[in-house]
Design a protein with these regions (language model features):
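Phosphodiester-processing cores and adjacent nucleic acid-binding clamps
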Residues: 1-191
């Protein structure tokens, strides 16, 4: 199958983004050359260029500057929509390492709100805020968090559904699908 796009999300940094984009662009150059040769030979071109999608999975805690207790936060993947979004991911990553490093590089919702433009947010599966609240606290608190993400990111908030045969995933998926239907949020299959 020919994929039109491929994404990469490093944990808390964008260190692999340069090599990732470079390799996709090299693939696209090779695909274009092969398609040109096919056309010149009277054949149907079969190579498909790919779009590189750059993202970062952040540890989102209550206060990224606090070092009074270990709070690794929730794991939330963010995707750049464009160059400005990429720059915002880079700013978030820098803040995570410069100001928020305590066991892991962390950000919080306040700094996320400063750099959310042109960024897509995913719910984060079982280790995301909503999934964790469904499992460990309760549906009302999970729905409150769900609505916060929807309010902040609007149509750029997507829910991840995981299926590895785990009972926890089944429980979380059932509730997430209910929230998605109730609040008109899109979802997708993920494999975290």
């Amino acid at each position: 199958q020919k994929m039109p796009a491929v994404a990469m999300t490093d944990h808390a940094n964008l260190m692999g983004a340069f090599h990732f984009v470079r390799d996709i662009l090299a693939h696209n150059k090779s695909a274009a050359a092969k398609n040109k040769t096919a056309i010149e030979n009277g054949e149907e071109p079969t190579e498909v260029p790919m779009k590189p999608i750059v993202g970062c999975e952040f540890f989102v805690c209550k206060d990224h500057k606090s070092k009074s207790n270990k709070d690794n936060g929730y794991q939330i993947p963010l995707i750049a929509k464009n160059k400005k979004g990429y720059h915002n991911l880079a700013k978030l990553s820098s803040a995570a390492y410069i100001d928020g490093f305590y066991y892991v590089p962390r950000i919080d919702k306040n700094i996320l709100l400063q750099f959310k433009d042109d960024v897509i947010a995913f719910s984060g599966g079982l280790r995301g805020e909503v999934g964790d609240l469904i499992l460990n606290v309760g549906e009302p608190q999970a729905e409150e968090a769900f609505l916060w993400w929807k309010e902040q990111f609007g149509d750029d908030f997507y829910v991840e559904l995981l299926r590895h045969g785990l009972e926890e995933e089944n429980r979380v998926n059932e509730t997430l699908l209910k929230f998605c239907k109730l609040h008109n949020v899109k979802y997708f299959a993920a494999n975290d």
